Amino acid sequence: MIRQRVQIMVSGKPWNITAFYPLTRYHVKEIIDTLYSIHCNRDDLCKAYKNLTGNQMNNGLTFSNYILRETVTVFARSTCPEQYFNLIVHELHHLSVHIALANDFDLAGEEVCYINGDIAQAMYPVCKQLIV
């Protein structure tokens, strides 16, 4: 499993992202501990645990703490490179929406698109190795 930490600037303030990929059941505790560290509530931790231990392919999750400006995103294993790319784009969309909502940005506005691009650019060095 790869753990990637990236930071983007949003409205002049940092937003920290921890990404895990590709998930296996051996890494569930580390991911749950990371979610707990950003104050993921009990219900969401239980949902995340079920998601992470379900051994599902083409699956992910994204949780953000808007106050701490921290996100944990997880990309499970996938059935093929195209599906893995789809999974990454899907979870990055959730992440961009979380950041937009935390900053009162218009979801239809350009700012959200730039945020999505900043995230993609920051995560590219790892993602490019996994989409082959």
Q: For the regions a protein language model found, what residue spans apply to each?
A:
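Non-catalytic terminal regions of proteins
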Residues: 1-53
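Short, solvent-exposed segments of well-ordered alpha helices
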Residues: 79, 83, 104-107
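Short alpha-helical catalytic segment bearing the HExxH-like zincin motif
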Residues: 83-91
